[in-house]
Amino acid sequence: MSAPARVLVVDDSPTMRGLITAVLSSDPEVSVIGQAGDALEAREAIKRLNPDVVTLDIEMPNMNGLDFLEKIMTLRPMPVIMVSTMTHRGAEATLAALEIGAFDCVGKPGPGEHRPFGDLAEKVKAAARTQRQFSQPAAAVAPPPSVADFRVGRKIVAIGSSTGGVEALIAVLQKFPANCPPTVITQHMPPTFTKSFAERLNRLCAPVVQEATDGARLEIGKIYLAPGGERHLQVSGGSAPCCRLVDRAPVNGHRPSVDVLFDSVAELAGRNAVGVILTGMGRDGAAGLLKMRHAGARTLGQTEKTCVVYGMPRVAHELGAVEQQLPLTAIGEEILKLTAARKEGTE
């Protein structure tokens, strides 16, 4: 048995520190080795204890979590899991943290929540195991091809991601031109975060990016992000495809689920689709991507070296669902190659 993941808990609330510590300590594969109430205490604790993982509150006195995270990533890079309030302001700050290099995020529990921090221990263990080199600077993103260079065909694109997906999706979608193929995305994320993430992507990318709504038509130049929460994103509609938000139990522990999206794309579009599975814990999306490939779609997976967590892409690759494994920096361009109109017509 490998050594437990060693964690430093940083939060200005003694109650929250106690709750996080209790949740993590209930897992024998996690060891809380220290606590800190602000960034100054945390800095000294990191030097003294050398933790494998830090859980970091965003809103703290003396120095907020974002400023402290930047210092960690610059001076002593390590896996950091952000702990945030489930508000619009908290979502904006968390998304900024994920772009800076935080491993993942969890929301602070609301009143009466049945399982507070239910997946935190699993995220901590994944963070401790990650092979990602946190000291590596983010690769520069090439400008998207111009409209004149890209003629869109008839295919739709479906993308699934989880842990590490914020950075990965930005890297992929910033390669898309304004006239990109219709694209649907399921990213595992808390309900209040997806709207803020869609707005952030819309500011960063050439196409229009929006949170998916029930009945929204799939259109060229638009990207639809599954809203977090109570429903799954599917596509349907035959010759006039549209988004559908459906009430179903969680699949693979997730709602929305990547498998649900990929299954619907396989049924609707068959060979006129491209499926992409990016970094993430677990196996959600692997079976659905295999279904897409069996239906004739082209399928891509992110390489282990460029994943924050090589979980979902690994399972998909082992199942035979992935036609090509590519580094993150190459995926956006490959999607455009696979969805471009042929010279003699459109596909």
From Swiss-Prot:
Class in the EC hierarchy, top level: hydrolase
Q: Which residues form the Response regulatory domain?
A: 6-123
* A Pfam family: Response_reg
Give the GO terms filed under biological process for this record.
chemotaxis
Question: Which residues span the membrane?
Answer: none
Record-level GO cellular component terms: cytoplasm
Q: What SUPFAM superfamilies does the annotation carry?
A: CheY-like, Methylesterase CheB, C-terminal domain
Q: What is its EC number?
A: 3.1.1.61, 3.5.1.44
Q: What about PTM?
A: Phosphorylated by CheA. Phosphorylation of the N-terminal regulatory domain activates the methylesterase activity.
- Keywords associated with the record: Chemotaxis, Cytoplasm, Hydrolase, Phosphoprotein
Q: Name one GO molecular function term.
A: protein-glutamate methylesterase activity
Write out the function statement from the record: Involved in chemotaxis. Part of a chemotaxis signal transduction system that modulates chemotaxis in response to various stimuli. Catalyzes the demethylation of specific methylglutamate residues introduced into the chemoreceptors (methyl-accepting chemotaxis proteins or MCP) by CheR. Also mediates the irreversible deamidation of specific glutamine residues to glutamic acid.
What UniProt notes about the protein's domains is: Contains a C-terminal catalytic domain, and an N-terminal region which modulates catalytic activity.
Q: Which family does it belong to?
A: Belongs to the CheB family.
Identify this protein by name: Protein-glutamate methylesterase/protein-glutamine glutaminase
Q: What is the lineage of its organism?
A: Bacteria, Pseudomonadati, Pseudomonadota, Alphaproteobacteria, Hyphomicrobiales
